[in-house]
A protein has these predicted regions:
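N-terminal leader segment of winged-helix/HTH proteins
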Residues: 1-41
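Alpha-helix C-capping/helix-to-loop hinge sites
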Residues: 7, 34, 56, 126-130
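Terminal interaction helix/tail motif
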Residues: 11-23, 114-158
């Protein structure tokens, strides 16, 4: 690859990154406001915790804090509220007595599925006016972005 090709690729990469960084928050605000307006009975940080526990059953309160970028005491208070709502269950880790693991309850799973369905419905409504070709382009672009993010995360772990 020539220097000009590398410069062009970097410029294109930066332009694409700018577009992603500007678009994702707009979409997230739209989804959050839509989920809220449809009567969600949970805060967005709590919804994020449900998502984390769905992907990583047995996560700890510290894991929740890292995921939300909050202190462990803040995460613990949030989890306490979720336990009181019967959305999350705390259990002693059988392999490490001082560690508490978190799992979703049936009510937590149901609420997460309902919230995801609401969000998907909202996005489907947003995309309803697009042509099949545009929808394919959007889908392909999102798949490429998800693959790139996954590859980046994997490379950071090794």
């Amino acid at each position: 690859m020539s220097d000009a090709d590398l410069t062009n690729a970097k410029s294109t990469s930066l332009a694409c990154a700018k577009q992603v960084v500007e678009t994702v928050p707009v979409l997230m605000r739209l989804i959050r406001s839509g989920v809220r307006s449809q009567g969600a009975s949970i805060s967005l940080p709590q919804l994020r915790v449900l998502g984390l526990l769905s992907r990583q059953p047995g996560a700890s309160v510290s894991d929740v804090g890292i995921h939300l970028d909050v202190t462990t005491p803040t995460a613990s208070a949030l989890v306490d509220r979720m336990v009181k709502k019967s959305l999350v269950q705390r259990k002693e880790d059988p392999s490490e007595r001082r560690r508490v693991i978190l799992t979703l309850t049936a009510a937590g799973k149901d609420l997460l599925e309902d919230s995801r369905a609401r969000a998907q419905s909202l996005v489907a409504h947003l995309l309803a006016l697009e042509t099949p070709e545009q929808l394919n382009k959007i889908s392909e672009g999102l798949s490429l972005l998800a693959d790139a993010a996954q590859a980046f995360q994997t490379s950071k772990k090794s």
